[in-house]
A protein has these predicted regions:
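Glycine-rich segments within core transmembrane alpha-helices of 12-TM secondary carriers
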Residues: 67, 158-177, 369-379
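C-terminal ends and interior cores of transmembrane alpha-helices
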Residues: 93-119, 306-323
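Helix-to-loop junctions at the C-terminal end of transmembrane segments
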Residues: 67-84, 282-297, 387
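Juxtamembrane intracellular "pre-TM" segments in multi-pass secondary transporters
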Residues: 2-15, 211-238
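Symmetry-related core transmembrane helices of the 12-TM Major Facilitator Superfamily/SLC fold
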Residues: 94-100, 190-207, 394-412
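C-terminal transmembrane helical hairpin of 12-TM major facilitator-type secondary transporters
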Residues: 298-348
Length: 426
């Protein structure tokens, strides 16, 4: 009997099938975030809601920053201890259906609220609904990241993260600009219903595949403590802290920088909705190529090196560019920043996948993401205060110099820790 079993080839998925299956899921997650944090404020204000209520949409970030708390429980359900079973596909698809159902409910709330002028109770109902949707989407993300780490080889991590970052740009476009255009043409309840249908369509590729089981029964119980005890996880947290702090410090300042130097609001919208998305997709492809043809250390050094140089170029432009060319150069540099940001994120998160334990990939990768989210919140607040007191040039000078130093330190650290990159379990 054992001879027969040894000749049975275990089910595996090719890189192409994994990427095709999971791409729509990553689009969905960003779509829901864009609906919550971009489109919902516009709907609230258009319906007569207060600016304070519109500003409260930043609370939808909370599930994404706090999902590390419930990640171990999700991972234990996804990878049952003592079993060869994997439940990523089942968990993700159920979550996708739940998201589509919640958007359908949101459409119904909007439809029945038309006659009454959209009272506050229905606005509050939408807020509660989208908070739940954000929690579901962030939970799906735990399972989908674990699925990618499980099914992709190390050489495929770059392409997997290209799809992840590229999918986020497409999702933001669908949940933001496309949704608002559909709302203007057909009313937002109809647009919301169309988004629900889109989510179901994006789920079909994953529904059509069969998730391979694990090759052996593993008794490991996923836990945050295990992650923090691993050298690989601590290295990953260090990389996130070093490499992303600089750009997160100035990222919220890009739009105010352009507005303060004369760019109109409509032109800013066109730049951020069209140019930034195209640049971001180009950056994801560049990141995938870097990870395919270079080592993680060299890829990070290149991507974050370009990012640091672009940040310092903003300082040089503010100090030396002629007045009639200043705005045009700044717009070009913002596009370069978008390319370098997407490229850097692909390289960083592909490296973090390599540092995630296959015993609990969802927990480890979620810990990295939540650290990045916390850095984004903290660095963004500090950057705004520094810009208020010392000006844009000081902020971009610090961010550029810090990013270049971090890129070099990360390269040295990864070069001296190559054994950690080839040993996910210790």
């Amino acid at each position: 009997m054992s001879d027969v079993q040894s000749n049975v080839k275990p089910l595996t998925l090719t890189t192409g099938r994994v990427i095709f299956a999971i791409a729509g899921v990553y689009v969905t997650q960003s779509l829901v975030s864009a609906l919550s944090m971009q489109s919902l404020p516009a709907l609230v204000r258009a319906a007569g809601g207060s600016l304070a209520l519109a500003g409260a949409t930043t609370l939808f970030m909370l599930p994404w920053a706090l999902k590390f708390i419930w990640a171990p429980w999700i991972e234990r359900w996804r990878l049952p201890p003592g079993s060869q079973e994997r439940r990523s596909r089942m968990l993700i698809l159920r979550g996708q259906v739940a998201l589509a159902a919640m958007l359908t409910i949101a459409a119904a709330i909007g439809w029945f609220g038309r006659e009454g002028g959209f009272p506050d109770t229905q606005i509050v109902a939408l807020f509660v609904l989208f908070m739940v949707a954000g929690t579901v989407a962030s939970t799906i993300d735990i399972a989908s990241d674990g699925f990618c780490v499980d099914q992709l080889t190390r050489t495929g991590y770059g392409w997997g993260n290209s799809v992840q970052v590229g999918g986020s740009y497409l999702g933001m476009m669908c949940g933001g600009g496309v949704f608002l255009m559909l709302s203007a043409a057909s009313g937002w309840p109809v647009a919301m219903l169309m988004m629900a249908v889109l989510i179901m369509a994006l789920s079909l590729p994953l529904w059509r595949i069969t998730e391979p089981t694990r090759t052996a029964t593993i008794p490991h119980v996923p836990a945050l403590g295990y992650a923090l005890r691993r050298k690989q996880a601590r290295l990953g947290l260090l990389l996130v802290l070093m490499l992303n702090s600089g750009m997160r410090f100035v990222l919220p300042l890009l739009a105010p920088l352009l507005l303060d130097h004369g760019l109109s609001m409509s032109a800013l919208g066109a730049l951020f909705s069209g140019g930034n998305i195209a640049a971001g997709i180009a950056g994801t492809l560049a990141g995938g190529l870097l990870m395919k043809y270079t080592s993680p250390g060299r890829a990070l050094l290149t991507a974050y090196g370009v990012q640091g140089i672009a940040l310092l170029a903003v300082v040089m432009t503010l100090m030396m560019a002629p007045g009639h060319l200043l705005l045009q150069i700044l717009q070009c540099l913002v596009i370069v920043q978008s390319i370098s940001l997407a490229c850097a994120l692909v390289c960083l998160y592909a490296t973090l996948m390599s540092l995630s334990s296959p015993l609990q990939a969802g927990v480890d990768f979620t810990l990295f993401q939540c650290t990045d989210a916390a850095i984004a919140i903290l660095a963004g607040v500090i950057g705004g205060v520094v810009a208020q007191h010392f000006g844009y040039a000081a902020c971009f000078l610090f961010a550029g110099a810090f990013t270049l130093l971090a890129a070099w330190v990360a390269y040295i650290r990864l070069h001296s820790a190559r054994e950690l990159m080839t040993s996910a379990i210790d």
